[in-house]
Swiss-Prot record:
Catalysed reaction equations from the record: heme b + 3 AH2 + 3 O2 + 2 H(+) = mycobilin a + Fe(2+) + 3 A + 3 H2O; heme b + 3 AH2 + 3 O2 + 2 H(+) = mycobilin b + Fe(2+) + 3 A + 3 H2O
Gene3D superfamilies, per the entry: 3.30.70.100
The protein's name: Heme oxygenase (mycobilin-producing)
Subunit relationships: Homodimer.
Start and end residues of each ABM domain: 3-92
Listed PROSITE patterns: ABM
Function: Catalyzes the oxidative degradation of the heme macrocyclic porphyrin ring in the presence of a suitable electron donor such as ascorbate or NADPH--cytochrome P450 reductase, with subsequent release of free iron.
Note: MhuD has the ability to bind 2 heme molecules per monomer but only the monoheme-protein complex is active.
Chain sites annotated for binding heme: 22-26, 75, 83-86
GO terms of biological process kind: heme catabolic process
Family designation: Belongs to the antibiotic biosynthesis monooxygenase family.
Species this chain originates from: Mycobacterium tuberculosis (strain ATCC 25618 / H37Rv)
Length: 105
């Protein structure tokens, strides 16, 4: 069953552009992982201060395999000057997925 994992990242005021830059530089670090379907980095606009990294996976097993291997390796040695002050992981199963046609009236 497809799953969605959302990393809610707490970012201090003014540090958002640096977080976005770091994600842009590493956007391809996960794309070839088995079971990875895609991700979006969401910038807060109103009513929320956290950034959300929304990832889509074929299964929880695929996510766990990435999180316990390549994700750890990708972050090794990158602890200097962290941008985030905290993060929490939200986990969901996809029970309905409706795609749009992209057409306008």
């Amino acid at each position: 069953m497809p799953v969605v994992k959302i990393n809610a990242i707490e970012v201090p005021a003014g540090a958002g552009p640096e977080l976005e830059k770091r994600f842009a530089h590493r956007a391809h670090a996960v794309e070839n992982s088995p079971g990875f379907l895609g991700f979006q980095l969401l910038r807060p606009v109103k009513g929320e201060e956290r950034y959300f990294v929304v990832t889509h996976w074929e299964s929880d097993e695929a996510f766990q395999a990435w999180a316990n291997g390549p994700a750890i390796a990708a972050h090794a040695g990158h602890r200097a000057n962290p941008v985030a002050t905290g993060a929490s992981l939200l986990e969901f199963e996809v029970v309905l997925d409706v795609g749009g046609t992209g057409k306008t009236a």
